[in-house]
C-alpha cells in the first residue's frame, strides 16, 4: 500500500517532532472549526429560547430550508472551491455554521439538556481520539476514502428518505452506520489535511499560501461536519426526549 511521503527536511508528526508550518496550519483549521461550533451553539440556543421564532421556523415550511440549506452551502463550497475567493469561502463557512445552528435548535427542543451534554462530550472524546490517531498513525488511510464516501452517501440518502417515512428502525440503522462513518472520516480527514499541507506548501510561495488559507477553511468545514454529525447520531441513539 502506498505511503504518504513528506518532503525531506521537514519533521514528521509520526516521528514525534512537529513541523512548525503544519502545526500553524492545523491550528488555523481548528480555530475555524471551534469558531463555527461556538456560532452554531449560540444560534441554536437563541432560536430554541425564542418561542415565536422557533414556531415560525419549525412550524412552517421554513423547516425544510433549515434542513437543506446547510447541505446546499456545503455542496456549493466544495464544487466552487477553486474559483471562490478566500473572503467568499469564509463567508460561506460562517453562513453555514449559522444555518446549522438554526437546524440544531430542534435538538434543544426535543432532547433533555443532560442528553445533549452527554452526547456532546461523547462525540468530543471520539472525535479527538480519532483525530489524534489519524494525525499520528504511520498507516496509510487513503484506501478508506472510497468506502467512507459510499457510507456517507448512503447515510445522507437514507436520512433524507426517513424525513418522510419517520421510521424508528431506519433511524436506528442510519445512526449506527453514521457513527462508524463519521468516526472513520475524522481520522481519514486528519491524515488528508496533513498530506495536503505538504503538497501545497511546496508550491509557489504566494499561490501556496493562498491555497493553504482556503484549505484551512475547507478542512475546518470537513471536521466540523464530522463532529456535528457524530454528535447528532449519538444523540439519536442514546438521547432522552423531553416529556410533554
Please give the residue ranges for each predicted region.
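A hydrophobic alpha-helical transmembrane-helix feature that marks the membrane cores
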Residues: 1-244
